[in-house]
Every structure is written in C-alpha cells, then in structure tokens.
C-alpha cells in the first residue's frame, strides 16, 4: 500500500481551482488499487471538505489534513483522528501583534472564519474559501475551543508579513511556527504540528512505511511534508526554493495534470 499526500492550490487543483476529470480518474484508479489519498492543505477543514465533495473524492480511503497538518479527518469514520491547536493566550498575543502592525489576522473554527472586519483581505480570501465570516475583535473570548491556526494576510506588502513572522518567531518560538503559503499569506500554527508531522503520524497510524509515502506541493508550507515523505514531489510551477528537496519534479504544471502523470508513473506504474 502506498499513500499520497497532496497540497490543493497550485498542486492538485488546476487554475480554475478544480480537480480535472483526468486527474480524478487517475486518483480513483489509485484508490481502487488499495492505495490511500490525503488532501493536505493550509485551508480550514470545512474548505477542504468542500473541495473533496466537489471533486467526488469524499469517499473511504481519502483523508483530509487541514490547517497545515494540524487537523486530520478520516472520511470513512467521519472523525477527526489527530489535532494540534494554538492556545488561546497565543491567539490573543498574535492577534494584538497584528493589530499593532496594521496587519489583518484571522482565525477559524471548523465551520467559520473569525475576522477583525469585513475588509479587503477577508473579501479576497473568501473568493476561494467559502466559509461564513464572524466579525470579532476578540475571538479568543468567542471561540468554543482552541483554533488550529491563525492566518496573517497582506495583499500587497510581503515585507510587513516578514517583519511579523520574525517577531512571532522571536517571541513565541517555544510554541508557534510561522510559514508563508504564498506572498500574501503567513500561516501561524502550533510548532509541534505542520504538514510533515501530520504525514508521519498518519503513516504510523495506518502502518504504512514512510518509504511508501509520497508528498506533493508547490509552496514553502509544503516543505515539511516533502522532506518527511519517502518520495517528495515538487510541482514544476512551484517555488524554486523547494526544488533541491524533491526526489521528483513534475514535467507538467498543476494546470496540465502534472500530478496525475506522477501518480501513473510512480504509484501505479
């Protein structure tokens, strides 16, 4: 049995944010052969579920690793089987850092986004992530449980996010990590989680040898799982800094079924 962990945006999904029919056919063939699929994303769980259902991949044999590996959901049993959260004291501290720096910070429940305002950043974000928005200046007082992550968003100024990242790592590196998933998005989550930690935990849970694991991605928040997997796959359209860590670089982009070709050659071949 082999297991494929794949990022969504710019990896599994094409430029229309869809799983192409061809890629879906290849994935279903992979599942029919007894292999496993993990949709591994920085997105919140509700959004990953939406992608899986739209692609008709909300089926046994598929797992959803959301919030950068902080939450793993098993479709077959309808259960969250693994989770790492951010303590509320740290939610408050990061939120207030963002406010002081004039940076949009948001956080999540499994079904909603908590945003400080209905601003340009949340309007941009919800074009792709279709979850309801709760406007809140103090989400740590309103959330029913600790969140899996926070997200800092700056639409036009990555440098501001770099400064925030350095501040978070200087002050809270005992508990938090902060990694870019794009030039606009800084992911902030429990330092003991991450896509790579989620990969290692699930392989152990399913008794699958790491050498039989594959991880595909395109951005820096995919690095930990690309390194952790027995076979790291980087999309040819991915950031150049990832290429040295890849055992496999796709010949085609996410918009040309690049991942499907790798599945056919390396998992089904």
Q: What spans do the regions from the language model cover?
A:
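Conserved ATPase-coupling elements of RecA-like P-loop NTPase cores
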Residues: 15-19
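Non-catalytic pre-domain segments flanking phosphatase-related domains
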Residues: 1-6, 25-28
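Conserved acidic, metal-coordinating active-site core of Asp-based
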Residues: 97-216
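Short, well-ordered alpha-helix to beta-strand connector turns
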Residues: 1, 34, 61, 147-148, ...
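Mg2+-dependent phosphoryl-transfer enzymes with acidic/Ser/Thr/Gly-rich catalytic loops
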Residues: 1-3, 20, 187-269
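Residue-level signal for inorganic ion chemistry
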Residues: 30, 41, 68, 150, ...
């Amino acid at each position: 049995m082999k297991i494929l962990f794949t990022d969504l945006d710019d990896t599994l999904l094409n430029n229309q944010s869809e799983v192409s029919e061809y890629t879906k056919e290849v994935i279903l063939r992979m599942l029919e052969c007894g292999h496993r699929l993990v949709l591994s994303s920085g997105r919140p769980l509700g959004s990953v579920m939406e992608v899986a259902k739209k692609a008709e991949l909300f089926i046994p044999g598929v797992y959803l690793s959301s919030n950068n590996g902080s939450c793993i959901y098993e479709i077959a049993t309808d259960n969250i089987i693994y989770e790492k959260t951010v303590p509320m004291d740290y939610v408050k501290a990061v939120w207030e850092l963002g406010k002081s720096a004039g940076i949009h910070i948001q956080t999540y429940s499994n079904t909603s986004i908590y945003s400080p305002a209905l601003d340009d950043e949340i309007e941009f974000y919800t074009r792709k992530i279709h979850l309801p928005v709760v406007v809140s200046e103090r989400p740590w007082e309103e959330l029913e449980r600790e969140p899996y992550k926070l997200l800092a968003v700056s639409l036009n100024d990555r440098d501001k996010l770099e400064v925030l990242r350095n501040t978070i790592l200087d002050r809270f590196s005992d508990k938090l990590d902060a990694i870019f998933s794009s030039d606009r998005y800084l992911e902030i989550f429990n330092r003991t989680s991450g896509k790579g930690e989620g990969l290692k935990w699930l392989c152990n849970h399913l008794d699958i040898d790491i050498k039989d694991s594959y991880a595909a991605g395109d951005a820096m928040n995919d690095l930990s799982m690309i390194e952790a997997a027995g076979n790291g796959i980087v999309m040819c359209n991915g950031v150049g800094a990832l290429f040295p860590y890849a055992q496999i670089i796709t010949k085609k982009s996410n918009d040309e079924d690049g991942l499907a070709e790798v599945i056919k050659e390396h998992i089904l071949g």
